[in-house]
Each structure stands twice: as C-alpha cells, then as structure tokens.
Amino acid sequence: MATGGGPFEDGMNDQDLPNWSNENVDDRLNNMDWGAQQKKANRSSEKNKKKFGVESDKRVTNDISPESSPGVGRRRTKTPHTFPHSRYMSQMSVPEQAELEKLKQRINFSDLDQRSIGSDSQGRATAANNKRQLSENRKPFNFLPMQINTNKSKDASTNPPNRETIGSAQCKELFASALSNDLLQNCQVSEEDGRGEPAMESSQIVSRLVQIRDYITKASSMREDLVEKNERSANVERLTHLIDHLKEQEKSYMKFLKKILARDPQQEPMEEIENLKKQHDLLKRMLQQQEQLRALQGRQAALLALQHKAEQAIAVMDDSVVAETAGSLSGVSITSELNEELNDLIQRFHNQLRDSQPPAVPDNRRQAESLSLTREVSQSRKPSASERLPDEKVELFSKMRVLQEKKQKMDKLLGELHTLRDQHLNNSSSSPQRSVDQRSTSAPSASVGLAPVVNGESNSLTSSVPYPTASLVSQNESENEGHLNPSEKLQKLNEVRKRLNELRELVHYYEQTSDMMTDAVNENRKDEETEESEYDSEHENSEPVTNIRNPQVASTWNEVNSHSNAQCVSNNRDGRTVNSNCEINNRSAANIRALNMPPSLDCRYNREGEQEIHVAQGEDDEEEEEEAEEEGVSGASLSSHRSSLVDEHPEDAEFEQKINRLMAAKQKLRQLQDLVAMVQDDDAAQGVISASASNLDDFYPAEEDTKQNSNNTRGNANKTQKDTGVNEKAREKFYEAKLQQQQRELKQLQEERKKLIDIQEKIQALQTACPDLQLSAASVGNCPTKKYMPAVTSTPTVNQHETSTSKSVFEPEDSSIVDNELWSEMRRHEMLREELRQRRKQLEALMAEHQRRQGLAETASPVAVSLRSDGSENLCTPQQSRTEKTMATWGGSTQCALDEEGDEDGYLSEGIVRTDEEEEEEQDASSNDNFSVCPSNSVNHNSYNGKETKNRWKNNCPFSADENYRPLAKTRQQNISMQRQENLRWVSELSYVEEKEQWQEQINQLKKQLDFSVSICQTLMQDQQTLSCLLQTLLTGPYSVMPSNVASPQVHFIMHQLNQCYTQLTWQQNNVQRLKQMLNELMRQQNQHPEKPGGKERGSSASHPPSPSLFCPFSFPTQPVNLFNIPGFTNFSSFAPGMNFSPLFPSNFGDFSQNISTPSEQQQPLAQNSSGKTEYMAFPKPFESSSSIGAEKPRNKKLPEEEVESSRTPWLYEQEGEVEKPFIKTGFSVSVEKSTSSNRKNQLDTNGRRRQFDEESLESFSSMPDPVDPTTVTKTFKTRKASAQASLASKDKTPKSKSKKRNSTQLKSRVKNIRYESASMSSTCEPCKSRNRHSAQTEEPVQAKVFSRKNHEQLEKIIKCNRSTEISSETGSDFSMFEALRDTIYSEVATLISQNESRPHFLIELFHELQLLNTDYLRQRALYALQDIVSRHISESHEKGENVKSVNSGTWIASNSELTPSESLATTDDETFEKNFERETHKISEQNDADNASVLSVSSNFEPFATDDLGNTVIHLDQALARMREYERMKTEAESNSNMRCTCRIIEDGDGAGAGTTVNNLEETPVIENRSSQQPVSEVSTIPCPRIDTQQLDRQIKAIMKEVIPFLKEHMDEVCSSQLLTSVRRMVLTLTQQNDESKEFVKFFHKQLGSILQDSLAKFAGRKLKDCGEDLLVEISEVLFNELAFFKLMQDLDNNSITVKQRCKRKIEATGVIQSCAKEAKRILEDHGSPAGEIDDEDKDKDETETVKQTQTSEVYDGPKNVRSDISDQEEDEESEGCPVSINLSKAETQALTNYGSGEDENEDEEMEEFEEGPVDVQTSLQANTEATEENEHDEQVLQRDFKKTAESKNVPLEREATSKNDQNNCPVKPCYLNILEDEQPLNSAAHKESPPTVDSTQQPNPLPLRLPEMEPLVPRVKEVKSAQETPESSLAGSPDTESPVLVNDYEAESGNISQKSDEEDFVKVEDLPLKLTIYSEADLRKKMVEEEQKNHLSGEICEMQTEELAGNSETLKEPETVGAQSI
C-alpha cells in the first residue's frame, strides 16, 4: 500500500485494509494481526493462484503498514504480552473470543498433534489447551493460533495459509476449529469490519475445504507412511488427531460454508453496495473533477473573454507599443496598443496552442487552456487578480504601464530567460530559477509519478505544471493519462515544447513590441511549458519510477505533489518575478486568495519542503531511513524527491532546472488557478486550488500558515530577486540563498537526524529493555513505517522539513538563493550519503565477513547484518541494541522472546512484522550475516533492524528505487550494488532505475512479503526460542530430560507449540525462501529485463529482501538457535542444534524458507510465480515433508551419521513430522541429541565453513543473498539454497511423498550442505548434490555425506582458495566485473529464473556459486576440481570405464578451458545436464536448471542474453562450470549415493545410459543418482568430450567477419537502422550457413543465431555505425563464437551421442530396447518422481507415464535413444534425434497439453497432491522410479542431449532451447525425472511430456500395461493429462512422476512458467524443429512406447535388482537402462 502495495492495494484494501483497519481497531488482535499476516502470507502462498498472492502481498503490506500505521494494532500487539488480552481483546466479540479460544486450543492441539513436541496428542487437546492458554502469553505458537483464529476471523482465506504455516495437520486442526470459529468470527468480523466478505468468501471457504480435504488426504498418507515406516505412535496419533481435526474442520467449514452461503446473499449485496458505494464515490469524484474541469473551463472561458477584452485593450496598446517599440510608457494609448498586441499574441498563442493541442488530446487541450489561462491569468494577474474581472481593463492599463516601464527589464529578462531556457533545455543550469524549478519539478515529477497513484493532485501538479490553467482535477486526469501513457505524455511534452518555442518566438516578437504583459504571459507560459515539458519529458519516466521507487510514498507523494504544486506556484512566482513586483504581489495575493492561503501555504511548504526535500534527499536519505518510523509521511515525499533527485543527481543541473521550471510552472499553475478562481469565483478557484492545497493542508495543516508566509515571502522575495536581479546574478544569488537555506536545512536535518538517531537509539534501548514500549514505538513508528515504508523513509524529512520549513519561512530569499548551493550541497550530501552507505555496506560486509570468519560468532553476524542493512550509524547502534534487542526481536522485537511466550504472541504480529523487516533488512544488510547460525545475534540484529532496518530496509527499498538500488544488485552485490547505485546515478541508470522501479515495486512487494514472512519466521523463531527455553527450563536438559518430560503435558504442549512454531517456521521460511527466490528472480529479471515492471516492483527493496528474506528465515533459525543458545542452549550445543530447530530450520528454513517465501513470492509475483510459488508455498507440503520424513526416517536414522544434517534435519523433520516425530517423543530427544551432537559438529564445521562461506558467499552473497541464507543454515547459500531448492522441488514439485522425502532429504542435504558448505565452490554442483542429497541423502545419506564431505572438502579447498581470492576480487574486481556484466548476467539470470521459476533457489545457488567463481580460471578450476572429484568418486564408486567417461568429461572440460565461450557452451551443456540431473533429483529444480542451462547455453536467444552475448557467454561459462561442477558433484554424489543405493540406481543407470543417467542419478540422487554415478562413469568415459576447435571457430568467424566488415565499412557513415542491422544479421547468417555443415540442428542453430544476433544487434539501433561499428563487430564475433562454439559443441555431442547410441544399442536391444528405454525413462522419471514413496503410483505412473512418455519419448527420443548412455552422446542424440523428436512431440502434444496455465493450475493440484501423495512410500517409489527414471533418464537425457544439442548446436532460440532443454531436462537430464520432466518439464515436449507424467501421476497406479495402452492415446492423453496435469500432474505426476519437483517445475516453472514459456517461447516451432523431430509417427512412437513399457517392466525388474546391484553394477544397469536411454 504505502510500501508499494499500491497496485495490490485495491484488492488488499478491499479485503485486507478494511479488515486491518477495522480489525486493528476492533477485531485484530496483535496475535491475530500477526496471525492474519502470517495466514495471509500463507494463504496467499496457497492461494497465490487465487489472487491471494496479491492479497497476501497486500496483507503483508497492510499488516505492515496499516497495522503499523494504526498504532492501535501495534498497541494491541503489545496487549498480547498478556496474550489473553490480545486473545480476548475488545477487538473480538465475546463469542468470537470464545471461538478463538477454542480454535487456539484446537490449534495448540493440532500443533501438538502434528509436531508431536508434546507427546500426548490428547494431552495437547486438554492440557495443551489449558497450558497453551497459560503459556500462550509467552508462546508465539499460541500467538500463532491466535493469529490463525484472528486471521480466520479476519479472513477465512487466511486460514489455509495459517494452517500451512502451522503445519498441514496443525493447519487442518486450526482450520477445523478456527474455520468454524473463525468463519463465524469472520462473519462477525465481516459485520464488524463491514468486510466479512474477504473472510466470508465462499470461494475461500471452499478452497479451505478443498485444502482441508487435501490435508486430510495428505495427513492420511503421512500416517500411512508413518505406519509403514513404523513411525512412533505419537506421530501416528498426531496424524490421526490431525486427520480428525481436519475432518472436524471440514465439517466446520462445511457448516461455515453453509452459513456463508446463507449469508452470501447478504454479503454480496453488502459487497455490491460497498462496490457501488466505491463506484459512486469514484463517480462523484469524477463528476466533481469534471465539474472542476468545467469550472476551470468556464474560468478559462471567462479568462479568455477577459483576455479578449484585455487583448483588445492590449492590441491597442500593442499597436502603440509596436509603433513606439516600447518607447512610450505613457498612457492609455500604450495600454490599448499593448492590449491589442496582447490580444494578437494571445490569439496567435491560442492558435498555436490549438494547433499543437490536437495531438496532445486532453492534456494538449488542457495545455492550451492552461496556456491561454496562463496568459489570461498573467494578464489578469497583472491587473489586480481580485478585481480583474470588473477592473481588468483598468488594471491592465495601469499594469501595462508598469509593465511597459518594466518592459525593458522584461525584455532583458526574457532574453535571459530564453538563453537560460535554451541552456537549461541543454541541461545547463545557467538559470538558477529553472534549476530550482527543475529541482522542485523533479521532485514533483517524482511526486507526480506517485501522485497519479496517490492523488489526482500529484497529477494536477504535473499536469498543472504543463497545463497550469487546467483544473487540478482535469490536470490530474490528464496527468494520470499522461503518466499512464508516457508516449502521450511525450507527445504532449513535444506539443508543449512546440508551444514553448512558439511562445518564445512570440516572446521575442513581443519583446521587440515591448509588451510586458505579453512578455510576462509568454514568459510565464514558457516557463511553465518549458519547465513542464522538460520535466515531463525527463520525468515522465522518473515519475512512474518514483511510484515504483516509493510506492509506499503514495500519500507522501500527495504531499510532495502538493509541495511541488505549491513549489511550482512559488517557483512560478520566482519565474514570474520577471513580471513586476506588483504582479508578484498580486499573484501571491491572488494565490493566497484563490487558494485561501493553502496554495501559498502549500507553495511555501512545498518550496521549503521541496528544498528540504532536495536537502533531505541529499542528507536525509539515511536520516529519513532512521527517522522513517517517526517521520513516515513527509519522508516519503522526501524519499520520492530524493529518488527523483537521486536519479537526477548525475543530471543535477538539468534536474534542478527542470525542478525549478516545474516548480515555477506549478506555481504558475497555482497562480493561474488562483487567478482563474479569482476571476470566475474565488470560492470555485479556492475549491479547486484548495483541493490541492487541502491535500497539502491535510498533510501539513500545521505548517500551512508558516508556509503561506514563507511562500509569500519566498515567492515575493524570489520575484523581487528576479525582478531586481533580472540577471542570472539575481538567480545565482537566489540559488546561493537557496543553497545556504538548504545547507541550513541540511544542518537542521542533520541535527534532526542526529536527534532522531539518538531517539532511535533510545527507542531501541527502550525496545530492548521494554518490548512493550517497543511495540508502542513500533505501533507509532512501525505502523507508519510499514504503512508508509517510503513514507516512513520520508517522515524524517517531514520533521526536517518542518525545521527547514521554518527556516525557509524565515529565509525565503535565502532558500531561493540557496537552491544552487542547496543542490550542490544536496549532491554533496547525497554523494556523501552514498559514500557513507557504501562504506557502511562495506563495513557491514566486512563486519558480516568478519563475523562469518568468526564463524559462529552468531552475535557478530547479525550485527554485521544490521550493519549492512542499517548503515554505519545504525551499525553501531544496532550492534549495541541488537544484543539488547535480541530478546526483544525474538520476543517480537517488542518483547523478550525467551521471557514470555505470551509476549511473543503479543508482539508477534508487530514484532513479526518488524522482525520480518528487520530480518529482511538483516538479510538485506547482511545476508551474509544470516550465514552465521547465531540466532541471538540475528535476533538482536532483527530487533535492531526491526526499526532501523525496517526504515533502512524501506528506505533502501525506496532508495533502491530512488537510487537504483537494484534488488539483484543488492542481493548479489548488496554492498557494491548499493554503493554503485547510491553513488552512481547515471541517466542510463535513472532510466534503468525507472525500469527497475517497476521491478522494485514487485520486488518491494516481494520484499514486503518476505519481510512479512521473515517477521513471521522471526516471530516463530522467537516463539520457538521461547518455547525452547521453556522446554529447556522444563527439561533442564537438552534431550536427556526431554524424553521423561515429553510425557508432561506442559512439555508436550510446549513441544507441540514448538512443532507448530517449526512447522510454521518451515512454512514461513519456505515462503521466505520462495519469496527470496522470487525476489532473486525478479531482481535477475529486473537486471536482465529492467523493463519488466513486475520484476522491478521493488527491485531495490526486493533485491535486498530476497536475500535478507532468504537469510531472514535462516537468520530466524540461526537466531532461534542462538536464542536457544542464549537461554542456555549454548550450553547444550547439541541441544541448541537439536532444539536448534533453528539451525535445522535454517537448513530446513532453506526448504521452508523457500516454501514460506514461496507463498509470499507467489503473492509477490502475484501472477508470475503464483503458480510456482503456490507449489513452493504448499505449507502442507512441509507437513507432507514431515510425513515423507517419516517415510525417510531411515534416512533420518542415517542422519545421525550425518548428524550435522540430522541435527538440522531433525528439526526439519520434526517440522515435517519425520524427525519431528522422534523429536516429539523419545525419538525426538534421541534424534535431536544425535542431530544436535552431529549438528554441533556440523555447526562448528558449518560455522567454520560458514565463515569461509560467509566470506566467500559474502561476495556471492552481495550478489546472491540466497547464499547467505544457506550460510545461515550451514552453507547458508548452498545448503539452504540447495535444500530450499530441494524443498521447493520436493515440497512443491514432489508435494507427494517425494515432497516429504525431499524435505527429509533436503534436511539431510542441508546438513550435507553444511558439510558441503566448505565446498561452496562447487555450490552449483552442490545444489545438485543438495538435491541429490535431498533424495539420495535420505536414501544414501551416509555415502552422500561421505562423498559430499570428500568432494566438498576438496571442492571446499578449491572453493575456499577461489573464493578467498574471489572474496577480495568479487567484492572488488569481481563486483566490478559483475557490475560490468550485471545487465548481461541479470538478463541471463532472468532468463534462467524465468525458466526455472519453480526452482529459483537452485538458480540463486548456481548464480551465487558462479559469482564466487568470478574468473574463468576459478571457474575452470572449480570445474576441474568438480570433474576430478566426480571422476575420482565415480571411479571409486564404479570401477568401470565410466570413470574414463567422467575423466573424459573432465578432460573435455579441461580442453574447453581454452575455449572459454565454447567451454561455456560445452560446460553449459554439461552444467545444463548437471542441472538437469539435479533437477531430475529435484525434477523441477533440475528442469529449471536444464532450462537454466539451456537458457545459459542459449542465453543469447533470450533478449537478456541477446543483450550481452559476451556477458552471457561468461555467465554461461560460469553457469556451465557451475553446472559442470554440479554435474560432477552430482555424479560423485550419485556415486556415493549409489554406494548406498547405487544398486538400484546403477541398474537403472545401466539401462539409462551412463552420462545422462549419471546426471540423472545426481539429480535423482536417491534413485538415479546412483545409476547415473555408475553408468555415467562409463558413459562419461564413452562420451567423446565435446571439444570446440577455437582456432577453427576463430577462422570461421574471421571468414564471416571479413565479409561483414567491408559491408559495414560501406555503411560506416550511416545510422544503424533496423534494415541495416537486419542486413548485417542476414549476411552473418548466410555466411554462417555457408561455413557450417548442414545438420539437423543447423536450422535450429541458425534460427537461434539469428535471434541472438537480432537481439544483440538491436542495441546498436539508432547509433551511428562509425560510433558502434567496433562494438557491433565485437558483438557479432562474440555471438558467432558463442553460438558457433555451442553449435559445434552440440554437433560433437550429437556425434558422440550417436556413437553412444550405437554403443547403447549394442548394449541394449535395438528397437525394443530403445522404445522400452524411452518408456523406462518415462517410468524412471515418473517413478523417480514418485520415489518419495509413490511406488504404487510409480508403477501406475510407469504404466501411464510411460505410455504417455513412451509415446512422447519414443517419438521424441527415438533418435537419441543411444544418447542415454553418454551424457554428451545423449545430448548429441537428444539434439540430433531426441531433441527434434522431443520437440515435435512436445510441440504436437505439448501445445495441446501445453501447460499454458498449467503452471498455476498444476500448482494447485500439485500442491494438493503433494500433500496427498507426499506420504507415498518414498524409497519404494524411488526404487520403482529408479527403474522408470533410469529409462526415463536415458530417454530424457537422450532427449535432453539431443534436444540440447539440437537447440544448442543449432543455436535454437532460447525459447526453443529452453524447450529442448526442457525436453532435455525431461529426458536426458532427468531420467528419473524424465517422466516428471516430461510431465511438467518438457516445454516443447514438456507439455505432452508433462501430460504423460500427469497421465503417469494419474495413471501411476495403473500398471505398465496401462501405460502401453496409454501410450497409444498418449498424444491425446498427454493433452488431456496436460490439462489434467496442470492440476493433477502436480499431485499425480508430481508425486509419482518424480519427486514432485518436476511437477513444480512443470506447473510452476517448467510447466506453469517454463512450460508456458515453452509453449509460448520455448516451443520449437515446426519450422524450427529438426527434420528428425517428425521421424516417428504416432504408430512408431506407440510401438516404441510399448517397447519402452516392456522396458519399463524391465526397469521394474531392475528396480527389484537395483538394491543389490545399485552399488557397483553399472554395466548391469547400463545394458537395459543405457539401451533404453540411448535407444530412446
């Protein structure tokens, strides 16, 4: 809302704002507030698809802003200190309170049941309820239940998210009790709020019912899994209770739904009435505006009549004047002549205006009107304005004499003005007035940009500036239109410029005629128009940017707009000082009269405010940040001004001039309005003007009088100065005075800032001391802060403005004079501030690094975070207050979290919000900080950041918007980007910032959501810590006491609450993680495509928040750990990790942060990621994960081996329910202890590594906040990211048992990631390993752990070395490199993100790792290290020729080291396959990675890539190397995993063909990883490492360039037109075709190359060839090199894959094996998709999916079947055959089946199925899936290889390549995920492939025979499945198909986003498809599918065999699987 929820504000306001406002006053308890926020975020995550993404954003914003703003809500937040108060606050009606109590009790029960922290599920129901009531005061979980209840009462829709937050079971229980109660409450609330509608919406209730039923199914499945796994009865009981509760909830929901349906008729009418009222109000407003316009028009007409009269008089005077040439000053004759001349001038002016008007449309008319009005007004003003109508002629004559007397002065002034205007137009600040005007204008322009959103007045400001006479309303409308339509605005500006030119001519002419009136009129008009036109032209973008930057500043912008209007008036006075002083006085009087003094007040205030704003912008950036809380309102305007100014600082002179002109124009507009009002009706004019003034008055009622005086004084002084000065000297003096005044104001502001800082410090101290007071302060400060995050930012400016306003009032002339000095001062201050910020950030980074180096200097890292986020000043204060605030922050940043759970509950809402922001800021400021697992520090930091960071965060967000603080830059290079953005404000940056600000709006929304989620997470962490402390107190022992105490209902209650906390934490952190991913994606997209408004929603704030949010959840866990440690958990480091729940959560938070962030992210993307996010969001999925954890308890048992993982994982599992179950009961203590002990060790190692990683990832962190988060967990970036990715993939994509499995795996992998933390260098591989770990760790945790330790230690050494160098280089040189490549990287990242929306964390991790590898040397080192490790591990794991393959791939990579671009391509393939394999493990993430890889390799195909092919290439290298690392690591991991599970997997690998299978195994570590590790080794050895002859490439490129250069030389003098560039592109393409051998992918390649060339050459359009010829040639050569290298690489891969095919065919029966392999690959994908315990589904999936997939796969993969054996070969085959075939099928089948909307639709179903199918037996399905996955892997890998080759070698446009890569992902990269990929990922074939997985998922239960029959209907069925898959695929295909991540990818990124992309972008068009694509007919495909189904049966047999043979028998697996893969 205030914080950029503007676009979302509508929905939010409708549903949430009223709820919030009413609930704040009446219904919203603090707990409820927070709960509502949480629930809203969660609900939005769940229902992101359902507009709840927006609503949740709004809710988050509302929670943050309205909740914070009302202060009541915050105070209520305090009341929860006595939690019963909050629960029973008067807000709630007695029945509602009773229901809330019941609901809370039930929630507590459900939490206890689900999380089984309290062992007694019944006890939880009874004792837990009682105790909860008792402990609710101190237990945030009670608070959360309260929140849930409150949310439910507020919004029924909030309930599902809350349930998710609490845990699927808890949520269900909460829903059961809370739905009935809350729905009733909602009804009541709706009655109370008048907004029952959002809470009462039947659709929401229905969705809840569906969710509850999903929960029931998932809970039942979890229970079944637990029963299968012999889970503890407590967990089963809890699940049973949960199911009962869910059923009760279902009943209650049904009842409530019935009630609602009964009430709906009433509600709907009420809603309709409300809507009608709104419409009526809007219509009234419109009518009023129209009336105002009419009145203005009437006034204009009256003025025109007066003008005509005056013109007639003037015409006479003009004639005399002309005759006299202004020589005669006497009498009426001169006056008459002047009047006549004036009439002529006016007529000409009007004619010119009218001529120019038509194009401008409304604005032009208004401009014309305003011009005429300006003349009329100026004329009428020159006569006494009040007496103008009756005495106009007399006054005109008298004034004409005066004017004639001053005519010479005017002529001089006009000449000066013209020269100055020309100079100003030339960006010269020669005219101080214009510079002043420009300053004010720029601020107003920003304000106008915001104003259209905020008020019509801001528009009126802008419009009034260009169209002074237009009524404010009309101007507002016109300005809104203008702002909305910059093109129109540009036209209008052009017209205005034309008019200004005409006016100038007229002015010159009338200067000759010496008509002072005309001069004054023209001058005024020119001033207004020129200023406005310049302002508009230059600030049209900035205005929307301002909106983006300061979306929260809407209200502030109204103020600013009013300021700008007033300033414009005052400036116009200044500008019109050219006119006589009498005129000035008259004008001021007229303005005062017309505005009833408000305009003058506004002007005065605005002027001062504007000057102050400028000053404040310079000085108050930080002050505003610090004062933001206290000074939310004016600060926003200041921040907006600052944003505009900041943007303008590079062009400060211009901007100053433009601001001055705008201000002058606005002043003139005000004056004209005043005059018009006076002429027609003072009242009417006052009505209009006072409307604007009243807005100002509303904002600054107290300052109006003073401001009026100051405005009058200033205006008069300025006019006097201008009149007296008449020269630039006067203006210089004016500027000097203004600068002096501004300096004084700056001093004042600095003093104020110091005072505010002191106050803030005191407040912080008070907050630490008194959380309650902190809450009140938060309610006072945070409420406005959250309400107006920008406003808060600007609030300090308000105070400063007040002080400076008084000064400026006293020093009006000085202020006017001060303008130049002020601007220079402001610039200096801005630069100083930016430098300070840079230094601050550097300090923070250094602090964070130092703290990280301290490792587990947990306190230090939060401090570093706060340093980074807060800034240098805040650094010190926050550090001091952090320790003090730690309790407060975790206590809700208001209360000591450890002290009172009730307090936590009380403060939770506000504290969470604050903590959210704090954490976000923490994370933002020190995303590295989050690396340290120091909850106490994080808590302190959070509390500290709660306010300051909030402010700074918000300020940073606006600042990022204002100063182009790119969220991506922030996330990736927070220090550097922040510095860079702050200090460097180039025009390009400004435009980029404007674009960014759109992103920033989105990002800010995401950041808000992240903050919200983070605050929730922090609150939950506080609750968790409090509960942990309580548990500690109760148990007095870390775990030994727990088992005995667990029986105690209190302990159960506490543990239940802890479980709830953890569940909610996991969900919230998943949300945070997803939101961070979203933010990272948005930021990358923003960086890549700053044009994308969505991506930039809150680019700056989002960029940091994504990292902070990601880090926040991790910080939360870290902090909770510290809190646990603080309460004495530090004493029990084992207990701290175990109870750590926070470290576990950090790791889990990786997952859950992802999930948590997903809901927010879903909300934030609103539409984009909502589907994908929904999957991630699926909080039930975490619960599912818990059940899957139960399924993976064996893995958990293995966890003790990986106890570090286990320590974190146990909590994750505890949250998820698997470890949770043991934790809850004796197992809880045991596993926690084990986890704790190992967690301790791992934490120590991890902390040590984290230090390293923090240092290493600091660099990457700055660029990639996500890495920081993983460091927090373990390797916050890697571990958490990988785990988050895995959790996202598993929870979202494998919402079914896979989700569970993946959660446990992810937990393990997080732990492993902790191990791998040191190996962050191979973080890209590590994500794969993490994912592999997620699946394979659970299955092979020990081996994976061992291997990961091995590899990661080695990699860690390499990475540490590299990163140690990279830390310095990345922070410095790498940052600069990254900065240089930022846009390219961002575009590439955006492409990757867009393709991998479902698994942004993997992308983040990958990019982070790539960033860490900031040099090609480091990248290659990492690649080689990974390759060596992988090949060594593969050789160890597999003593076969596979090692040679691995080595060969290493050698190939090494050989590629020479060929950086080609290596990039080759490595991109490998990395793509690595990623794809990773994705196969996490099919979604892998698919996204494959997409990423394809995007990376084909980066130039996408516009972002095309933008910078070189940078893209470099990034490709990075990503390729990262992928190679991931692939190698995954291979190693797969091999290690294969040691444990290799038997099955390797068998599958044997079938699945080595390299692809290896990748698949890595990806599907549990199943395929082993196979791939075994087979891939031989296959890798078999893979002829694709090598690119760089010399040959260079020769080829030179041959091409030889032809191109002469052509370019011929046109060297020409401008690069599209035709010329097209001809160049065609020439290059033709030459390339001549030089390239024709191959099947040549067509693809050429199409891609053409696309890339077109994109890359497009940036040269409009430039002269001679200026950009060199760059153009370099660009062409780079593109050619990259694409040709890629093409050749793909050719090599294709040839290799063909050879591999042949080898595989030898190994496997030729045709049948191929088809069976395709089917098996499908099965493997599907089965692997279902390995999470979907064996049954897997079999069905195998049948169905394979039927579909076999059709698809056999069709798509016929050619590349052999490719399966070798990754390269597979790739080649995939490209050559599989890819084309895959594309064809995916095109034919996918288009029909294309998940155009599948991503979102599938998300819902998938989410549901994630819950439902999540419980499916993970290992069994994994085994079964392993077979299917192997075959599918082979197929998919083959497809991917071929596809990739086809796409890459053919340089298929990124779209196609993405499609092909999706296919690759589906086929080669994700054998295990092949089905899932085919289900979801195949973008080209993804649609149909996705549908087969859907078919598989839906049909998974069906046996293979079904698949065969389905194979025949596969194409149609795939289409059916596509649609079905969109919904069920996520659930059915997702769970059976493979680790539901594929589903997530499918519907989220791959199918929903990526699949849609593939449909829209990635779909390889028929003409693009290689000829091979059509090779197979449906019959052939069906035959192949049948064969594959047979093969699938073989895979089933293999699966049976796999357990034994998986370890080392890759050949055995190879033959069937490899044949399948290769043959496919």
Curated annotation (Swiss-Prot):
Q: Where is this site: Breakpoint for translocation to form PCM1-RET fusion protein?
A: 1609-1610
Q: Offer an example of a GO molecular function term for this protein.
A: identical protein binding
Q: List, as start-end ranges, the regions of compositional bias called Acidic residues.
A: 618-632, 1768-1777, 1799-1815
Its keywords, alphabetically, are: Acetylation, Cell projection, Chromosomal rearrangement, Cilium biogenesis/degradation, Coiled coil, Cytoplasm, Cytoskeleton, Phosphoprotein, Proto-oncogene, Ubl conjugation
Positions with biased composition (Low complexity): 634-643, 1905-1916
Name the segments for region: Mediates interaction with DZIP1.
Answer: 2-1460
- Single GO cellular component term: microtubule cytoskeleton
Cellular compartment(s)? Cytoplasm, Cytoskeleton; Cytoplasm, Cytoskeleton, Microtubule organizing center, Centrosome; Cytoplasmic granule; Cytoplasm, Cytoskeleton, Microtubule organizing center, Centrosome, Centriolar satellite
Q: Which residues does the record list as N-acetylalanine (modified residue)?
A: 2
| Tissue-by-tissue expression | Expressed in blood, bone marrow, breast, lymph node, ovary and thyroid.
Composition bias, Basic residues: 1296-1313
Q: What induces it?
A: Expression is reduced in breast and ovarian cancer.
Instruction: List, as start-end ranges, the regions of compositional bias called Basic and acidic residues.
Output: 43-61, 1089-1099, 1192-1201, 1835-1860
Annotated positions for site Breakpoint for translocation to form PCM1-JAK2 fusion protein: 1314-1315, 1369-1370, 1470-1471, 1947-1948
In terms of InterPro entries, this protein maps to: PCM1_C (IPR031446), Pericentriolar_Pcm1 (IPR024138)
Where in the sequence does UniProt note compositional bias of the Polar residues kind? Answer: 116-132, 147-163, 369-383, 425-445, 456-477, 708-719, 925-946, 1152-1173, 1232-1246, 1783-1797, 1818-1827, 1924-1933
Q: Which residues carry this modification: Phosphoserine?
A: 65, 68-69, 93, 110, 116, 119, 159, 370, 372, 384, 588, 643, 861, 866, 869, 872, 960, 977, 988, 991, 1185, 1188, 1229, 1231, 1257, 1260, 1262-1263, 1318, 1320, 1573, 1697, 1730, 1765, 1768, 1776, 1782, 1958, 1977
Q: Which domain of life is it from?
A: Eukaryota
| Region Interaction with BBS4, annotated ranges | 1913-2024
Modification sites for N6-acetyllysine = 399
Give the record's disease field: A chromosomal aberration involving PCM1 is found in papillary thyroid carcinomas (PTCs). Translocation t(8;10)(p21.3;q11.2) with RET links the protein kinase domain of RET to the major portion of PCM1. A chromosomal aberration involving PCM1 is found in a variety of hematological malignancies including atypical chronic myeloid leukemia (atypical CML) and T-cell lymphoma. Translocation t(8;9)(p22;p24) with JAK2 links the protein kinase domain of JAK2 to the major portion of PCM1.
The UniProt family comment states: Belongs to the PCM1 family.
* Oligomer status and interactors: Self-associates. Interacts with C2CD3. Interacts with BBS4, BBS8, CETN3, HAP1, NDE1, NDEL1, MAP1LC3B, GABARAPAL2, and GABARAP. Interacts with CEP131; the interaction increases in response to ultraviolet light (UV) radiation. Associates with microtubule; association to microtubule is reduced in response to cellular stress, such as ultraviolet light (UV) radiation or heat shock, in a process that requires p38 MAP kinase signaling. Interacts with CFAP263. Interacts with SSX2IP. Interacts with CCDC13. Interacts with CEP290. Interacts with PARD6A.
Q: What does this protein do?
A: Required for centrosome assembly and function. Essential for the correct localization of several centrosomal proteins including CEP250, CETN3, PCNT and NEK2. Required to anchor microtubules to the centrosome. Also involved in cilium biogenesis by recruiting the BBSome, a ciliary protein complex involved in cilium biogenesis, to the centriolar satellites. Recruits the tubulin polyglutamylase complex (TPGC) to centriolar satellites.
This chain belongs to which protein, by name? Pericentriolar material 1 protein
**Lineage of the species this protein comes from:** Eukaryota, Metazoa, Chordata, Craniata, Vertebrata
Tell me the name of the encoding gene.
Answer: PCM1
